[in-house]
Structures are given as C-alpha cells and as structure tokens.
Amino acid sequence: MFKYVHHVHYAVENLDAMVEYFEKNFGMKPDSIEVSKGNHPAKEAVYHAGITEIQVTEPLNTTSKLAKHLAKHGPGVFHVAFGITDAEGAQKRAIANGNEMRRKEVSVAPRGYKTVNIEPSTSHGVGFQLIEDPDIKLDSK
C-alpha cells in the first residue's frame, strides 16, 4: 500500500530557531515559509529531501491538535505521511479494519493532495496520514 514517504511533519516550539538550525547544521533553507490562520493557526517551513517533504510547524495558539500534541509530548515528529495511489480505497479499507478517521470524508489539503487521517486512538497511539498526491506519478502496484 505505501509507495513512498510523502512527508514528515515535525512540531516545534520556535520555528525561527529551527529554520536557523536547519541552515547551520544541514545547509538547507526552506522552500517556503507559510502562516495559516483559522482554527489551527500555525507557522510552517517546508523543505524537500528528494520527493519527500519535511514540514516543520510552530502552532500559533494553544488549542489546535498540533499545540496540544506539542504540550503533551514536546517537540518532535507529529506524524509521518505515506504516499498511496487510492485515498478513497485506503480509507474504506482502514474503516473496514476497525479504524476511526479524523474526518468522515477524504479531505483535500491546501496544496491539493487528498488526505486520509487515521485516528491515533484506533492505531495504537500512532498518527497515520495517507496521501494521494496528483503531482507525484506512481504505478498503482
């Protein structure tokens, strides 16, 4: 089912400090830095390692899922997203196997890819995100 690692999402307390760390230690500058508003305001730097995206995000409030995760677990990996070829099929399979979803329907991320988010309480506490990204062409095997 998994074709590749689509992205690794890190939760951090200070994005500016982490951007500086990436540049100093890895020689990497972010491809973009974005600020999102709404129910889950955050500041995010995006890097790439091959086709894998690295998302480094600082929550800008204390009530978002990311902020609550950061408060409980500290900085680190929030989730790893795996690239797949059929989001709807993957969601149906996960539900048939007893998993709950964070959203009833497959959702579309701001960057245009389809996401399936398995509720960690039904996956042994681990957050799984499955991504069907139309910009990355893969065979369906």
Residue positions per predicted region:
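Vicinal oxygen chelate
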Residues: 1, 5-13, 45-50, 55, 67-89, 91-141, ...
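Amphipathic alpha-helical segments
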Residues: 14-30, 92-97
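N-terminal strand-loop-strand beta-hairpin
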Residues: 27-49, 53, 117-119
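A short, acidic/glycine-rich surface segment
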Residues: 31-33, 63-68
